[in-house]
Each structure stands twice: as C-alpha cells, then as structure tokens.
C-alpha cells in the first residue's frame, strides 16, 4: 500500500516500459528471458490499475520490425491506457554489439512498417513519437513525430549533416554506436 500511495502522489513520475512485440515468443526471444512478455503485460496492467503514467518503449531491431503494424494495433486494442508510445532506433552498444547480426537493421529498411505503425497510432489519437532515428532516414510523413532525443554527451553529426536543412530538428547519431546507416544524407 505504501508504494502504491507513493506512485499515486507522484504526478511527475513516468514509467518507461520496453515492449518488443505483440507476440510473446518474439518478446521473450529479444529479452532472452522466458516469460518476460507475460511479466511485462502484468506489470503494465498493474501500473494502469493505480493510474500510473506509462510510456511504451519499442526499440526497433531486425527481430521485431516486421510486426510493428500489428504491434500498433495490439497497443490500441489492449493498452489504450498508456500515455506515450515511443519507437526508438537501436543504439549499437552493449548486448547489441554482441548480437549485432541478429538485431541491427538500417532504419531505412523498416520505414514502411514504422510508417504504418506510427500513422495508425496517431489516427487512433494515441501520443506517438520517434526517437533516435535521424530525420533523413524517415519518410517525410514521419518528420513531425521525430524528436531531438539523443543526449548532448553522446550525440554526433557526420559531415553530410552540416549541409542538412533539418539538422536543428534532428536527433543526430549516437557517437557510441559502432555502425551508422550508409543512407544518411542532407535534406
């Protein structure tokens, strides 16, 4: 009861919860923890039951990008209580380096799926954003959802970015990532 009261009294508290797929096997495979999907869903509903603000964080990778449209529909039907939905580009550090061939995908290669998912959620009046994907890698229909999101201490811009008309709005690139998209170009 004490922790419940603490959460209820904290109007500035936002829970950022990763959800990797609408399909439990995919979610568990990505987290490498059997049962993590079920635990995540229980946690989401528990937080919702006490009125907590929830941000769903969907880190896009090679293992989940094809189901982004289905995931958006799942969120709309089953998780309408979430305050924010954030689609996030993958930072190529930590476990993603070890599993690079399994998880890394050039953002240019999942634009169709991302566009469908984001547009669906926006049309259904859910608050949706895109983080950590340079604007030049997005379809123009997605520009308005892109956030300048990479922390100052780990953002970088390559030479091509200096000529870009959208640089002041763009999240840039992770200086910590070992690989960048070859499709980065000025707009």
Q: Where are each of the predicted segments found?
A:
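Glycine/Thr-rich phosphate-binding loops of Rossmann-like dinucleotide-binding domains
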Residues: 25, 95, 174
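Radical SAM enzyme core and accessory elements
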Residues: 158-187
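Radical SAM/AdoMet-radical enzyme domain recognition
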Residues: 3-88
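A C-terminal junction/extension of Radical SAM enzymes
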Residues: 67, 84, 90-162, 167-169
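Short, surface-exposed linear patches
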Residues: 14-15, 37-41, 77-78, 107-110, ...
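Short clusters of hydrophobic/aromatic residues that line enzyme substrate/ligand-binding pockets
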Residues: 27-31, 104, 110, 170, ...
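Residue-level detector of alpha-helical recognition elements and their boundaries
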Residues: 42, 55, 71, 86, ...
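Extended interaction regions within the primary functional domain
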Residues: 9, 56, 141, 146-154, ...
């Amino acid at each position: 009861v004490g922790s419940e009261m603490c959460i209820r009294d904290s109007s500035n508290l936002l829970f950022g919860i990763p959800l990797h797929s609408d399909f439990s096997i995919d979610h568990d495979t990505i987290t490498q923890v059997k049962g993590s999907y079920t635990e995540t869903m229980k946690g989401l509903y528990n937080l919702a039951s006490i009125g907590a603000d929830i941000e769903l964080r969907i880190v896009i990778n090679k293992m989940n990008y094809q189901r982004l449209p289905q995931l958006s529909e799942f969120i709309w039907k089953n998780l309408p209580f979430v305050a924010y939905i954030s689609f996030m580009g993958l930072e190529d550090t930590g476990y993603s380096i070890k599993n690079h061939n399994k998880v890394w995908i050039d953002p240019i290669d999942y634009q169709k799926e991302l566009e469908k998912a984001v547009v669906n959620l926006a049309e259904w009046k859910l608050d949706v954003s895109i983080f950590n994907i340079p604007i030049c890698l997005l379809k123009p229909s997605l520009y308005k959802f892109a956030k300048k999101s990479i922390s100052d201490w780990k953002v970088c811009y390559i030479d091509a970015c200096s000529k870009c008309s959208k640089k002041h709005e763009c999240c840039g690139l992770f200086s910590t990532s070992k690989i960048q998209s070859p499709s980065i170009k000025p707009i």
